[in-house]
Amino acid sequence: MFLLGHSCWSYIFSKITGRQVKSSLPAYMALLAGVLPDFDIYFKPLIQHHTYTHSLIVLVPTCAVLALRFRGLGLAFSAGILSHLVADSIVGTIPPLYPLSDLQVGISLGLPSPADTALEVGALGIVLVIAYLSREYKLVTESHKEAVYLAIPLVSIVTLTLLFAGDNNVPLAEFAFSRKALTLITLGHAALIGILGLGVFQGARAVITTRKQPGHPSSPPSGEAQPSGSPLPSNTSP
């Protein structure tokens, strides 16, 4: 699956799990979790893509540690990570027992394929609905300092896409519009990147505005210093 689907399904599974355990995972972490297994691309050729970071032997213990250490937030984040393996096993295969075995397991519906396109574009639609109902869409439409952290999944999605294309000698612009299915997925990526970019802009604007306010540590002192607040809105706390 492409990063559009991975980030969106991660958001969906993380938010659903977080609601069940009464922990609200920030939007940027919910989007990032499902992208993490593809971080092996950053470490090529030291680590071959689609090996260790796509193995249950590696990820299940990692997620267990996260859940034990961070409780509800760890469970929600882990749900996003594991959604990556579920998605890849639907449209392709994964090596669940690597490095003990090279066995590949999956339904392998195809990539790209109508099924994959429906899963990826559909996931983006579900994310927009959840963001609207949970009011997280305000990270994009209003100034909130937390929104600046959306830069993390934004940069990850863009750089991983470029690196993967470069490593595999894929002419990205030509490939993106070579088939109708890919065109829809490309437009979905563009929409997601645009939304995240707008959120980062709103976050940066909020940070700059806060720093200019009297009483902020970076502003000239005016009377008694005021304690600075948390950079995260209270509604994102567990």
Where are these regions (language model features)?
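N-terminal membrane-targeting hydrophobic helices
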Residues: M1-P221, A225-P238
